[in-house]
Amino acid sequence: MKKSDLIIVRGAGDLATGTIHRLKKSGFHLLVLETDHPAAIRRQVALSEAVYSGSTCVENVEAVRIESVEQMRQVWEEGKVPVLVDPKGESIRLLKPKVVVDAILAKKNLGTTKDMAPLTIGLGPGFCAGEDVDVVIETKRGHNLGRIIRQGSAYPNTGIPGIIGGYGAERVIHAPAAGRMKNRSKIGDIVEAGQVLAVIEGEDGSTEVSATIDGLLRGLIRDDYPVTKGFKIADIDPRKEELANCFTISDKARCIAGSVLEGICEAVE
């Protein structure tokens, strides 16, 4: 492949954004595919926000929502990244990209197959390298984070977040009830354990969402987003002094991005 060839990235959450950012800065032509209602938590560093706002910028890379593939080249000419609502990846067959990166991070394969492109890359569990994709990238924190897997799968999803500042599961908040989020806090706020971060308005009334630990509110799902019970809705960083982390791509995302870039560069002529 050549640098001018099309790469399609499925998903634009915070981890996917790390990959999109790296590939854009490396000079590749990208098209990003998203759902019509992305559920990113770390919204300040998720290019998926362009679906709602029309455009968004993360670390000097701007993403712009497009309504059809015909608008893609114009966005490229402006030096930006086009984002198309296409959750099923129907545009992939039409555009015939050289690379498809599944960065949805759904912990399962939502439909990416090896025949979509000459090179297919899946991030995290749910893919088997050599079967449904060519390459899998490990996304679990630890010694193997970012490892390129050419045969087999990434570690299965444990449901236990990686440790940050001595906290794991405690730093991630899930919806205690179903309903619509009514946020009382914003990303970047210093919060205390027990503090009400949001209220979920459901059919059976209102349910408060409280901070689980003291720290920095690093992620919070969009206001008015409809959630189901158990849905991931917030993320607290116990390192209160790390405000910049709320607005910059994480070490984990950058590590994964480097591995994706390596996998693609091996195929560049």
PLM features: residue spans?
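Well-ordered secondary-structure scaffolds
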Residues: 1-269
